[in-house]
Amino acid sequence: MVGDRVVRLTADNPSPMTLEGTNSYLVFGREGALVIDPGPDDEPHLGGLIALAQTRGVPIRGIAVTHGHPDHAPGAAPLRARTGAPVYAHAGARFPHDVTLEDGDTIDRDDVQLRAFEAPGHADDHLVFWLQDDGALFTGDVVVGRGTVVIAPPRGDMRAYLATLHRLRDDFSAARAIYGGHGEPVTAPRDKLDEYIAHRLERERQLLAALATGERTIPELVTIVYCDVSRVLWPAAARQLLAYLIALEREHKVHARTLERELSPDERAILNPDLSAMVDPQSAAVAAAELGYDDPVDRIEVYGRR
């Protein structure tokens, strides 16, 4: 529980990508509750959400989903089947939903008004939800309680993500708490957003500095820019570097050329790792979606400064 009106229930799906698990939230009104991010299709978790609503003597009247990744959205359909509550999602959502939300739309159920705002970057179908009366900002995987999030092509976009962070910092200065998709609530929202922005810009500075000394491939760049993180995380780091490089190439700050050779085993391990050998099947599905492995890297490119 995080407050009288907002209650958190964390799914039992811990992993390197989900921290302790996916956070689902119930926002209570006098006559009903809204669920934000039902999480995975997990019977104990969905049953727990229903039980929490029953303890307040109210039904679940709506299900709002921040984005379509498999640790956030699959529980929506079975929860709808059990409660009859409509599912609200982004216009670009690739999962079944009843109501499409545009930027600034309001979910108005009884005395709960939840505004939706587009928040691309981590995913192209991402929304955040604003409970203005409580100063509560529900950020899904845009901002989490601990660490940072993965921005990976093809559905992740680094420039869109930075724009989203700036928007959240500048337009939601009244926020008293951020409730992320993973980890604990953030009680100093502006400080956290400043930290996130500074972190992304520093990684970009490190990337450009590494390229200033000559052309390099992404696996080579990983060992330089992310030398401070565990090798286990290098595949995720590689995808984030790809997001930076796509943006920088679009802005004519770097150039790329394809090397006419196959990926080496070490390069393949970083660019297209075998997730099934690293984590359990459920965690592998989440990681594949987060890291964009439905779009594998099948060629090696070398990048340089313009």
Regions inferred by a protein language model and the residue ranges of each:
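Histidine-centered divalent metal-coordination motifs
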Residues: 66-72, 122, 182, 244
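Active-site HxH/HxHxD metal-binding segment of metal-dependent hydrolases
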Residues: 20, 33, 40-115, 135
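Short hydrophobic/aromatic-enriched beta-strand-loop microsegments
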Residues: 84-91, 138-140, 196, 231-233
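Metallo-beta-lactamase
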Residues: 32-35, 40-43, 113-206
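C-terminal regulatory/interaction regions
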Residues: 209-306
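Conserved beta-strand hairpin/beta-sheet module of binuclear metal-dependent hydrolase folds
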Residues: 1-56, 128-140, 145
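Residue-level signal for inorganic ion chemistry
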Residues: 5, 49, 182, 207, ...
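Residue-level signal for the nucleotide or nucleotide-sugar donor/cofactor binding architecture
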Residues: 74, 156, 236
